[in-house]
């Protein structure tokens, strides 16, 4: 009778094990410490140099700068090292201490890696032309010279919030900023005096 019985091996149910999936965080080239976006360096520099800057903005800029190590060439061309060095003498201990950390780390790295350049990311000439025009419009609305630090800071903050692109949101935001500065004298004075932070001003007009 056994020859008519097909025997199959018994399959034992093994306990199900929940496998923990590894979560990988994708790294972008800009997240690397030695990859330096020149535009970001210049934007943070204007934040550090703008008079009556808030402690929060200074700390935020220094924390971003701490994530990067510019090459000797970038330090020389942007003078960001000088800006950080000046902040070391800030009256607030936290700001001064953070600036000292950034400055010391950069100096130590440059001295130990003189022959290792960083990767620099620049804007193209067409983009720079559009931005110069935006700065011109902002300077006229603010009644300041085009090379004034406040004009540069507003434009760079706008460019940053628009993903560093000359796109429709950038153009519309610039127009909104210029219109407000021209026709709202009280806001213009608040921006010029520093009572209305540049970041807040630009963010509220972002299109």
From Swiss-Prot:
InterPro entries attached to this UniProt entry: TFIIS/CRSP70_N_sub, TFIIS/LEDGF_dom_sf, TFIIS_cen_dom, TFIIS_cen_dom_sf, TFIIS_N
Entry-annotated residues carrying N-acetylmethionine: 1
Residue ranges of every copy of the TFIIS N-terminal domain listed in the record: 39-113
Keywords of this entry: Acetylation, Nucleus
Keyword Nucleus: yes
Domain spans labelled TFIIS central: 130-207
GO cellular component: nucleus
Chain segments annotated as coiled-coil in the UniProt record: none
Subcellular location field: Nucleus
PROSITE patterns membership: TFIIS_CENTRAL, TFIIS_N
Database matches in CDD domains: TFIIS_I
PANTHER family per UniProt: TRANSCRIPTION ELONGATION FACTOR A N-TERMINAL AND CENTRAL DOMAIN-CONTAINING PROTEIN 2 (PTHR11477:SF14), TRANSCRIPTION FACTOR S-II ZINC FINGER DOMAIN-CONTAINING PROTEIN (PTHR11477)
Protein name per Swiss-Prot or TrEMBL: Transcription elongation factor A N-terminal and central domain-containing protein 2
Species assigned in the record: Rattus norvegicus (Rat)
